[in-house]
Amino acid sequence: MNDINLEQLHNILGRKQYPRITSLETSFLEGKKVLITGANGSIGNKLVQKLTGNNKINLLSTDISGEFERLDITDVKNVKDVVQKFDPDYLINLAGAKHAPEGEVDTWKTFSINTIGTKNLLENISSKTKLLLTSTCKSANPEIVYGASKLIAERMVLNEQGSVARFFNVVETSGNVFEIWNSIPESKPIDIAPTCERHFISLDEAVGLIIFCLNNEPGRYIVNSGPLVKMGDIADRLFPKREKTIIAPRRGDRLTEKFLSTSESIESYFLDTEIIKVKNIHD
């Protein structure tokens, strides 16, 4: 969503971007080997951009396709060859099947990538490697395959003393609703499910959360995103003069997003209150 400006971003978030989380340094990674899976995605590209800004980091960026070294996390041999050869100090798992409606249809693909893929990585890292899983707010009281697949992956990683960076909806990622709205000609109405409520964070905040997790003790972390925002209100703020067509939520979309699950609570705050460590009664 390259054409959205900072004021529009604030309108979507309902707040300004957090200054501390978006300015975290990467000096603690100097001299370390960092492997990223899923580096071709929006968050992956932004993270690669940040880490390559420090030429003292030994970075290996991978994805199943594209410009980076090939790594299919569902392919055990491929994982073994790449991960064991590089032997990273930090492994950031951004690879995943992330589209909720597709997950309800192609359930095995979603489970294979998000859950089995994470298992493959865990089984092929050495004892020195800290694994960070990027996850989703849909893992909190999951109602769909995508959320459930990520919840299982979270538990596996936490059981092995890894960390989880759980994201809310990241505004600037490819394929998001705002990108879709922007692509619709102004002469045509935009489709909205106005009562759907979501938490939002920015792309820079998502990358900042990853950096924070790498440099802190194992656990489950989220950006303190602020209150829920109704999609109808966002559409009215972004496109006050546009005609809107009201539609029902898509298959796989819940009406109200969860901040925490019913078994979770806030353990502690960091960077003032920008980041929250989440505890679960089952930890």
Show which residues each predicted segment covers.
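Conserved Rossmann-fold cofactor-binding substructure of NAD(P)-dependent oxidoreductases
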Residues: 70-88
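Conserved internal alpha-helix within the Rossmann fold of NAD(P)-dependent oxidoreductases
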Residues: 76, 118-122, 210
